[in-house]
Amino acid sequence: MPQAGKRSNMKFKMIHENYNVMDLDKSMAFYEKALGLHEVRRINGDGFTLVYIGNEESSFELELTKLDDHPQAYDLGECEFHLAFEVDDYDAAHKLHEEMGCICFENPAMGIYFITDPDGYWLEIIPSKK
């Protein structure tokens, strides 16, 4: 066992984030339109469905989970967590999200804004560093 404070040779790679959703089709349509994410794979289990969505820009995936026996909306607390997306055409993305009516917070001083998905999860949009 490694000693506290010593660096080990283990390498960790982030591979996915999970969001529980109420309406899988609605969520998938939102992520496709808003962020260009599409279904990578699906697992249909006993009482649940997992759909992993992603794109060619990264190997990181978002796992959308639909639990069959969870009829009420999820309590997201104060939404102090979020997933960030870097976009190559910030102005076009902002225009699309404005048209979709999903922008929930803007911080022009920092050059960023946030959108919400159908379940209330916050997603940060930041411009590519050029």
Regions found by a protein language model. Give the residues of each.
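Acidic-residue sensor for enzyme active/binding pockets
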Residues: 61-63, 124
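Vicinal oxygen chelate
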Residues: 5-10, 13-22, 41-42, 51-56, 72-130, ...
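Active-site/binding-pocket entry motifs
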Residues: 59, 68-70
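N-terminal beta-strand motif that seeds the catalytic metal site of vicinal oxygen chelate
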Residues: 2-28, 80-83, 129-130
